[in-house]
Amino acid sequence: MATSASSHLNKGIKQVYMSLPQGEKVQAMYIWIDGTGEGLRCKTRTLDSEPKGVEELPEWNFDGSSTFQSEGSNSDMYLVPAAMFRDPFRKDPNKLVFCEVFKYNRKPAETNLRHTCKRIMDMVSNQHPWFGMEQEYTLMGTDGHPFGWPSNGFPGPQGPYYCGVGADKAYGRDIVEAHYRACLYAGIKIAGTNAEVMPAQWEFQIGPCEGIDMGDHLWVARFILHRVCEDFGVIATFDPKPIPGNWNGAGCHTNFSTKAMREENGLKYIEESIEKLSKRHQYHIRAYDPKGGLDNARRLTGFHETSNINDFSAGVANRGASIRIPRTVGQEKKGYFEDRRPSANCDPFSVTEALIRTCLLNETGDEPFQYKN
């Protein structure tokens, strides 16, 4: 099992320094999405006092030519704080700061999908859209081999691992528990965790979150997971099909509701939304992974609890459908629906924006509508 060199350093020595007092100063770790649309970057600055809100945080900049976001001749990019959380690694009063990225001309960077998503969310705020996203991921060694798998073969077939207990069924629970507690400390709206169908595959759920909070909380939860894994010396991958063959892929099932859907006879509005989604399948497939559907093509095969990428389907309690209505929702005739198409490496801002555009703004066609300011 290959682990990183850093994980073999003596953590007790580090703790000697981390327990030193820091006076009135505060360390703020600025986090942003890089030019891949999947990778996260971070750097830290010192503040003179503890910020009470995101509006007290200064803007910053970075070298975009080193993050696939600009040319070297004009490489300064702006970091504009968007959301602030407690820092579970350095602890209070230190902060994690999730940022939007803007180019030299103050236009949003290509992978800053939060900017437009926020505008779209503000247009429908009176409908109180709630989201919950189920983030699946796979633990890997630094050699790219799944954590806990035999070095020269495969574990036993899928079956005993989903929500499994025991050393031969659950691979890497220490990481899952550390991540869970770190998210709770940070103020992330983490709803739960479970072991998934493939060994070394896990899931955590974020939500319910209203509007733009969904993307902020999921991205920072991903960042915390990467940092926890860094300490343990392993890798968390959000690849939607990390192991080819008869193994489950990794998705980011997205649960969605509005105030009307959650109230009596809300099932009517759920069914209306599903009808709208059925007529815009390809638009959503393009929005549901960072490569415009190419990543999901490896996962959405119609097998391993997925729908086929080329077909739209919906059903009650059907995990082989594009859209699943939970059985309890069908019985109570109100609640939410689950879009099972987003890939594990999706951008939650892209996914939630697409759902709002189609279900609430009644957009049709293969391209998003351009609204005036």
From Swiss-Prot:
Database matches in Gene3D superfamilies: Glutamine synthetase, N-terminal domain, Glutamine synthetase/guanido kinase, catalytic domain
List, for all copies, the residue spans of the domain called GS catalytic.
113-373
- Entry's InterPro entries? Gln_synt_N, Gln_synt_N_sf, Gln_synth/guanido_kin_cat_dom, Gln_synth_cat_dom, Gln_synth_gly_rich_site, Gln_synth_N_conserv_site, Glutamine_Synthetase
Binding-site positions, Mn(2+) 2: E136, E196, E203
The Swiss-Prot or TrEMBL record lists the needed cofactor(s) as:
Mg(2+); Mn(2+)
| Residues modified to Phosphoserine | S343
Q: What is its main location?
A: cytoplasm
Renumbered residue ranges of the record's region Required for glutamine-induced ubiquitination by CRL4(CRBN) and proteasomal degradation:
2-25
Q: Which residues carry this modification: Phosphotyrosine?
A: Y104
Regarding the membrane, this protein is recorded as: Lipid-anchor
Query: What influences the activity of this protein, per its activity regulation comment?
Result: Glutamine synthetase activity is inhibited by methionine sulfoximine (MSO).
Positions contributing to Mn(2+) 1 binding: E134, H253, E338
Q: Which GO terms describe its biological process?
A: angiogenesis; glutamine biosynthetic process; intracellular ammonium homeostasis; positive regulation of erythrocyte differentiation; protein palmitoylation; regulation of endothelial cell migration; regulation of sprouting angiogenesis
Positions bound to ATP: E134, E203, F204, Q205, I206, G207, P208, N255, F256, S257, R319, R324
A cellular component term from Gene Ontology for this protein is: plasma membrane
User: Which keywords has UniProt assigned to this entry?
Assistant: Acetylation, Angiogenesis, ATP-binding, Cell membrane, Cytoplasm, Endoplasmic reticulum, Ligase, Lipoprotein, Magnesium, Manganese, Membrane, Metal-binding, Microsome, Mitochondrion, Nucleotide-binding, Palmitate, Phosphoprotein, Transferase, Ubl conjugation
Q: So where does L-glutamate get bound? A: N246, W247, R319, R340
Q: Give residues where N6-acetyllysine occurs.
A: K11, K14
PTM section of the record: Palmitoylated; undergoes autopalmitoylation.
Give the family per the record: Belongs to the glutamine synthetase family.
Assembly notes: Decamer; composed of two pentamers. Interacts with PALMD. Interacts with RHOJ. Interacts with BEST2; this interaction tethers a fraction of GLUL to the membrane, causing a decrease of cytosolic glutamine synthase (GS) activity and inhibits the chloride channel activity of BEST2 by affecting the gating at the aperture in the absence of intracellular glutamate.
Q: Which PANTHER family match?
A: GLUTAMINE SYNTHETASE
Name under which the protein is recorded: Glutamine synthetase
Please name the gene that encodes this protein.
Answer: GLUL
